[in-house]
Amino acid sequence: MKIYIPLVILIIGTLFFTSCSSDEESATTAAAAAGAAISTFNGTFNGTCAGANEKTDIVVISDTTAAETTMVYSDSECTTKSHANTLNYTVVSTTTATVDAKSVTKIEGTTTTSLSTIYTDSRVTNANEGSWCGISDWVKNTAKDVTGLTCSNLNETYGSAGVKKYDIWYLSGSTFMHSGFNSDGYSTSLDYSKTKE
């Protein structure tokens, strides 16, 4: 009987520590699978200048929000702004995946607002005279909420709020790569590369 008691204690102790170790490993695995915190991506990321009157993409990430801006410049050096459209999202990271041999974080975004901004006097005049997007009080450098609107003057249809979209993010140093938000699910490729300011 004296032999069995220490043996029972040893077995119980072994099972206890094995269980604790397993729980710690599970917690570590779950934390890794959850993906990087959004805050690790915070910053403004600029796409390559597309030239005069072409669309240059900018992404701004701040904790639980992300904004995708399509900026049009009037000069080839992309220094003089003409107009821009911005799609705003609330975002959460869901899990990790390997895409293009890189460990990416999967992002689920929910649309909040779509904004349109005009930066030149002549374009403001045209917008007000033509009531672009049904709006006739455009002001230079001031964003207008165009969420859910169809703007035939601009050949643009802006999405409604509350729409789920998906993206994948990768950050290495000052290089940010992503696929762009879309409602069809997570992309299997990193299609765009931007540089952090």
Tell what function each PLM region has.
Residues D23-A67:
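Acidic/polar, low-complexity intrinsically disordered N-terminal segments immediately downstream
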Residues P6-I11:
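Sec-dependent N-terminal signal peptides
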Residues I12, A37, I58-V60, H83, ...:
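A generic structural signal for short, solvent-exposed coil/turn residues
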Residues K2, G13-N42, L190-Y192, K196-E197:
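Bacterial Sec-dependent N-terminal signal peptides
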